Structure formats: C-alpha cells, structure tokens
Amino acid sequence: VCSGCLTAAKEALESGARVDEAIRAHVVRANNSRYSKVNEIAKYLVAMFPQKGTVMTQCFGETIVGMMLKEAKLAGKEVRLFCPETRPYFQGARLTATVCHDMGFDVTVITDNMPAFVMEREGVDVFTCAADAICLDGYVVNKVGTFQIAICANHFGIPTFVTGAPDAGHPTKDTVTIEMRDPEFTLQAMGVRTAAEGVKGYYPAF
C-alpha cells in the first residue's frame, strides 16, 4: 500500500492533479482489493473445516479471522476455537479471542506453552494462522510462536492451513528480517514484572 501511495503521489505531481486525492483513491482501491481477496481465502479455508470441530489459531488478524468466522456461520459449521495468548503483547488473547467471542463462538485462551497438550487432549481438527509474509519460494513467516505450533500439528497429523497471498517483496526467506526487540518485554506481563531483577530476556519477533 505504501509503495503504491508513493507511485500515485508521483503521478499526481507530474500530471498536476491533487496528491491527497490520488493517495486516497489508491488506498481505497487497494483495501477493496485486499478485502475481496481475504473473503475468498476465508471461503476456501472454511471449506477445509469439519462440520463440527475444533480449530486452533494463532494471533489471527481481525479481518481474516472475522471473515473466516462469518463464512463458518454461513456454512452452518459448529466451530470451537483454542487461541494461544501470544506473548508478550497478548494479541491472541486481547484481539483474536475477542473477535471470536464477539461473533458468538466458543473460544478458549491458552498459554503459549500449551498447544501440544491441547492438541492431544482436546481433539484439535485444524490449525490455521495468517501470515505476515509468504515468500515466493514457499516459506511462510508469521509470529515466532507459530513455528512450534506448526511442528506440533505435524506431529499429531493435524492439517495446517495458512491464509494469505505470496508477497513479491519477499522472493526468498533470506529477505525476511527477524527483529530482536527489547528483551525487557519478555520479563513482564502488561507492564507488571514477572521475573527477578538480573534475569535476562530474549525477544525475537517479525
């Protein structure tokens, strides 16, 4: 979207048109195109769900999880969800689980170290997540914790479905940068310190 806005602005300047209107028009077109694609992706995803089953997800963007659940309702599918909390910002608990609850679904938040146990004990049918980037070489990049959940799902024979589209900005996984953020965030929960002073933290993120 940003690169498209820059292109639209340059073209507007060259043609003498209003830059703000050109940028706004581009954003509207880009978002409409994006939401249309997301809705189609949601339909394909829900088609993979059992008529009545259990789905585990991971810090799912509100747009796609909302469309996924909308399509599940339209298809008459009874779905319950397990959602890892996604520390240290708790996006899974605060955002994803809230959307699921607001749309009337049975949703349970679990800590980030529980997915394997829940998969084995609760009969998870599908693991699905969004993708911050899908590289052209096939690599999928999402929240760091997604990696371990996908491995667990593979171990238990649970199908994994990723929602998203290939990103031309990432031809290979080598173009993806895993950022090392402030480790202090892993030593606290919502601003409340949970580790002793002097303990080190480690916080890789994308």
What is each model feature region?
Residues V1-V109:
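N-terminal active-site beta-alpha-beta segment that forms phosphate/nucleotide-binding
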Residues T86-F206:
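Conserved phosphate- and dinucleotide-binding cores of soluble alpha/beta proteins
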